[in-house]
Amino acid sequence: KARLMPWKKTGLTFPAEEPASDVEDILEPEIATPEITEVKPREPIAFPWLVMSALLLALMAQRTLEPPDRSIGLAVALYTLAGLAAVIAWFGLRQWSPPPLGEEASQPLPTTLRRTPLLIGCGLLSFAFLAFGGNQFNSFNLTLWLAGGALVMYALWIPDPDASSFGQRMRGWLIRPEWKITITPWTVMVVLSVLLVLFFRFDRLAEVPGEMFSDHAEKLLDVADVLAGEHRIFFPRNTGREAIQFYLTAAVAELFGTGLSFISLKIGTALLGVFALPFIYLLGKEIGNRWVGLFAFLLAGMAYWPNVISRVGLRFPLYPAFAAPTLYFLVRGLRRRNRNDFLLAGLFLGIGLHGYSAARFVPVVVVIAVGIYWLHSQAAGNRRQVIWALVALAFVSLIVFLPLMRYILEDTSGMFGYRALTRLGSVERPLPAPAWQILLSNLWKAWIMMFYDNGGIWVHSVVGRPALDVVTAALYFLGSVLVLARYIRSRNWLDLFLLISIPLLMMPSALSLAFPEENPSLNRTGAAIVPVFILAAIGLESLVHSLRTQMKPIPGRIAAAGVTALLLLWSGVQNYDLVMRQYDRQFMAFAWNTSEIGRVIRGFAESQGNPDSAYVVPYPHWVDTRLVGINAGYPLKDYALWPENFAATLEEPGAKLFILYPKDQDSLAQLQQLYPQGSLQVYDSVRDGKDFYMYYVPPMASDTGG
């Protein structure tokens, strides 16, 4: 038994625990781990050579997969050796093991409820459902909806008999008002980690990425509708979009005074990206320990993948933002057998359905998670109760989803599901191969994207490279091997779910059957960052724990700190370069320079006094003329002027400015014939291939006052 459970000889402490900090207590108390019988510790070895060999082999393997020069065969061989070394280090030499899973609660889930508030809440929700007609939020239906939902939550909520009420705590503080702040090394590490993550997520946010494209114009038009008092439940523009981003951006525009602009979109989505990180920490802590949580928080916070999908200003981070708390509360509810956690999971699940269409697969993930739990021995004595808890979760999520449900039943155009159907079926184009073949191929490509290729979409990725940096990919591989080995040995449902959740959360990308070239994509796989970075953190924590426990105390501490610092530094430097240099250069090379055109038009308007006498002549596959207006500071103005309408500008006596694509010689010839007094200049863009023509027409003589 000791050989099968090696941690009983090496201890579980990683690193030497400081006294529990206020930060940790506020975030979440841990479940007490079972007391471990002390076994005479084995003599510390000089160095855990096999553990470090596994790490070095994994790092070398991933380095060979970095573009442009790749060696797939060598990488497979090195990764195979790394996996074998990790397994031997655990089972053979007992030098390595993942952090142990804490003891799960044994009491069954409660099934009691408060009937009266439940009935009243359901009644209010019925009226709210009717009041949501017309695809509009208003004070009446919102009041009914929120009041009904609050009553249902109260009816299903299980009070904690050991927790004092807010009123009691407030009275106690008023009697003896005092503040107690304890600063420990752990507190300092948490604060520094938060500051580092905020730096990665907000540094140069206004500049990277530096241009908008057509989707941004659509989003800002919807935000303009919100600011104008149009409070839709579902926004049908551009094949339909859920509402959260538009209300969030409107709030940012008003709160920060940024208006209808690219930075308003980016501030909102960057905040959503940060919102997911505390729940990644908490889930890592629930699955492993606080070090797993902190490492997952750091690795995900610095990583290029979640950073770029948060910076681009579209709805992409909404998928992980609400999947992370859903998964955290679901896992905690199953482990602790606490129905309140199921209710919170349902709340975040429902909110996520108002965010990004990829979140529509999360309910399937929740059901599969409960199914995996139900089939394992950890569910003994709790199987019937967990089904009722799942029903409560689904009911709460349905309440939050209620406005969209009303819209779906009322809308006859099928707009809500149109985008998904165009990818899943042959609505827009026939499937290029049998569906099952495409699905298997897509799943494989999505699964290996962490190591090999994250897709070819320049908008939100560095095309053709792995989704993870070298260090994180290697740690993710090692963490996955350790968790898989632990599942084979102990058959704990959580290990299996942690591994299976990754392809499940990638399904919105893999289900692009009609357009397999869109898979993999970092946006539709976004929620997979939650288990991916937790597995990477497990790999790092187990590595450092091995150094601490297998070596003598002082050398072990030094080695653990040094290896951790080196790996995090390597990861941080590469991720910063991926976002701030590689992604930035690639994005700006592909995106059209509407910001430069906007600055030219704004300068013309300020000098000539009339923004309405500047025009952009459209040309196929060139700039979106709506973005020109946004960049010029006139966000609701479309600057397009088609050649057939040139003559209408003769009625304007003032100065005029026409912006043209250099290849559009026909339009230029028409303007020169119409305005022979005009002058042509070439705007020399700072980016290659992005020059444009400026055809300036001076004001008529009578308009100058001469």
Model-based region annotation:
Residues K1-W186, L344, V365, A369-I372, ...:
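Membrane-embedded, hydrophobic transmembrane alpha-helices
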Residues M153-P159, T326-L344, G352, S377:
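Membrane-interface transmembrane helices that cradle and orient dolichyl/undecaprenyl
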Residues V208, T472, P555-P643, V686-G689:
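Membrane-proximal, lumen/periplasm-facing interface regions of secretory-pathway glyco-
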Residues M212-F234, R241-A243, Y247, E254-T258, ...:
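Transmembrane-lumen/periplasm boundary regions of multi-pass, lipid-linked membrane glycan transferases
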Residues L260-I263, I280-M302, D495-I500, R557-A560, ...:
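Transmembrane-helix signature of polytopic, membrane-embedded enzymes
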Residues I267-I287, P325, F477-L484:
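Transmembrane-helix motifs of polytopic, lipid-linked glycan transferases
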Residues L298, L318-R335, A345-L349, I502, ...:
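Specific aromatic-rich, kink-prone transmembrane helix
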Residues I309-S310, F316, F361, V470-A473, ...:
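Hydrophobic/aromatic-rich transmembrane helices and adjacent perimembrane loops
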